[in-house]
Amino acid sequence: MAAANSWWEIRILCHPSLEETAFWRLEKFGCLGTSTEKKAHSLLVRGYLPQEKAEILDLAALALWCEQDALLFQVPKPRFHWQLIDEEDWSISWKEHWQPTPVGDRFIIYPAWIDPPENSDRLILRLDPGVAFGTGTHATTQLCLESLEMRVEPDKHQVLADLGCGSGILGIGAVLLGAAKVYGVDNDPLTVESARHNRHLNQIHPDNLVINEGSVPELEQLIAEPVDGIICNILAEVIVDLLPQFTPLVKPHGWAILSGIMVEQSQAIADALEQNGWTVVAIWKRQEWCCFQARREEGD
């Protein structure tokens, strides 16, 4: 019989191109905490879920979805494994794989359970991701933070939007760089809680980083006027669907940072941007992922 505080540890050994999809699957499955570890030519993605939240049949269905994702991406099927561990083992297993991570020229990301130094030549971004995607270790998150280093100009008092804010890491990063205000939305209420916790962890006032549950309609209600820039680090097909909706929320000549995009999906994103009145300024690539920086053309 499992202990009262048992957790499922779910392990997915997969092709690197499946990393973000695997994270997304685990998040939607309800995992509280995820991590990734490089293994030769593969990646080991872990997720943790209270035992009472899933039965064996649920886990088998999750494994099948991951296999279908691999077929879609035309890569080898992942190796899927699950086991029950106690609560203390879960906490240790997840956290031991995550250490302070320098990102770009300006940031260093510190897990909440590691005390940061009193003095640093980098901006210290503290994070406890909980259920949310965005620990700073994924290529797409790093590309977005590095893009923000180029786009955020403190003397311009920029107001930004973060669509699908996850752990809040990108909105927090923007405020640390000098953005006057960031509006973040995510359609997962647990993720919103995580982002608000991280906002507090970084001592950012709620007026400077507004975090609400929702998507584009809620973002439209939050902002008083079009924003200077928008950040969107989610799946490519979702970006294509949402582009017509969020384009009017950005000022003419405003910018967008878009990631969560596989390299082979970049043409579809470029086409969607052009169709919605955007010009691609730069495409940065890392591993199998890319990040678009785009500028909105003058409105009608």
Swiss-Prot record:
The keyword Methyltransferase applies. One of its GO terms (cellular component) is cytoplasm. Methylates ribosomal protein L11. Keywords: Cytoplasm, Methyltransferase, S-adenosyl-L-methionine, Transferase. Its EC number is 2.1.1.-. Coiled coil: none annotated. GO terms for biological process: methylation. InterPro entries: Ribosomal_L11_MeTrfase_PrmA, Ribosomal_PrmA_MeTrfase, SAM-dependent_MTases_sf. S-adenosyl-L-methionine binds at residues 141, 164, 186, 233. It is found in: Cytoplasm. Its main location: cytoplasm. It comes from the Bacteria. It is an enzyme of class 2 (transferase). This is Ribosomal protein L11 methyltransferase. SUPFAM superfamilies: S-adenosyl-L-methionine-dependent methyltransferases. Pfam families: PrmA.
